[in-house]
Amino acid sequence: MANVTVRNLPDEVHRALRVRAAMHGRSTEAEIRDILETTVRPPERVKLGSLLASIAHEAGGLTDAEAEHFNQLRDKTPAEPMSFE
């Protein structure tokens, strides 16, 4: 994991962080980590399958007949594990 050093942090900010950490029942360091994580990470990462499903829905989706056709064309054989020998 990476380490970050914050220099010249005003005393008022450090005090506010300590108070906020105490309110949440964690250390100041854990509070700062939580603030950074919630600020820079999206609340929920969009997964590829969900994104593709929403695009298909916006485009009008598939009829039951089209979905069944794709289901019949799909390769249903189980994947073989890779051999490194």
UniProtKB/Swiss-Prot annotation:
One GO-annotated biological process of the protein: regulation of DNA-templated transcription
Top-level taxonomic group = Bacteria
Q: Does the keyword Metal-binding apply?
A: no
Q: Which residues form a coiled coil?
A: none
Q: Note the SUPFAM superfamilies from the entry.
A: Ribbon-helix-helix
Keywords carried by this UniProt record: Plasmid
Q: Where is this region: Disordered?
A: 66-85
The entry assigns this protein to a family as follows: To P.syringae pv tomato plasmid stability protein StbC.
Please give the name of this protein.
Putative plasmid stability protein y4jJ
What organism is recorded for this protein?
Answer: Sinorhizobium fredii (strain NBRC 101917 / NGR234)
